[in-house]
Amino acid sequence: MTAKNISLDRYKQRFFGDFLELPGLTEIAVNRPGELYTKINGMWEQHAVPLSYEDCYNFARCLAKHHGDNIEDIKPGLSATLESGERCQVIVPPACERDTVSVTIRKPSKIQIPHQGYIDAGFYNRVTNDEKTETHDEELIALYNARNIPLFMEKCVEYGKTLAVAGETGSGKTTFMKMLIQYIPVHLRITTIEDNPEIIFFKHRNYVHLFYPSESSDEKGSVVTPASLLRWNYRMNPDRILLTEVRGAEAWD
């Protein structure tokens, strides 16, 4: 093991070692200094930890160096894998909030499921048209047909349906979206993708604000764009992603 490998392993063990050994753990997320989230059996749990901004940034730099890469303000995102197999996504300012570093670690499953296990669990039911309509869908259809649109919208947000808010400039699209946030269950993990910090969370705690320069989507070669932030989300395991603007290729991601 080289010196840089030893440094990375020491950081991993010091900051995350105890949590990585938790039974059933699938994810670790650090959104800001002093707090860490674990995901076990599909549920997020918050932990207070003595983890500073400098600690998180040093881990990010060490991870980048280990892979012959770099992470800094002009290249603020890195997707990488630890030697022990955990996949990481790290994001530093200005692509996230000032004085924060977003660190997400995904622990690979060691369980091998046989094909029959998938069959018994109904994995192919959607293909064979044997899958029953979800109760949520039936409820939403009933609300829509009854023209109870206010409750229909609230439930769409609660159940995680994809919503697009369209309107002319100054029509209140972002304000309307911010109102709907209150119907997202508070235990879920949320990421936002914004060109300006507009979204404020009052009840939710497990969230990460991601930012891109407003002109970035128009510049060829831009490192931080709505589309790149959306791709970084693939390793951040959010339950909800909020985009304040959809103006380009990110619509297809």
Where are the model-predicted features located?
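N-terminal accessory targeting/assembly segments
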Residues: M1-S84
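Structured core elements
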Residues: E27-A29, Y37, S79-T81, R87-I91, ...
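Conserved nucleotide-binding/hydrolysis micro-motifs of P-loop NTPases
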Residues: G34, W44, P94-R98, S109-I111, ...
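Generic domain-boundary/flexible-linker signal
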Residues: K39, P114-Q116, F201, W252
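P-loop NTP-binding catalytic core
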Residues: W44-P50, R61, K65-E158
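Switch/coupling sub-region of P-loop NTPases
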Residues: A142, P150, K155, K161-T169, ...
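Conserved glycine(s) of the Walker
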Residues: G172
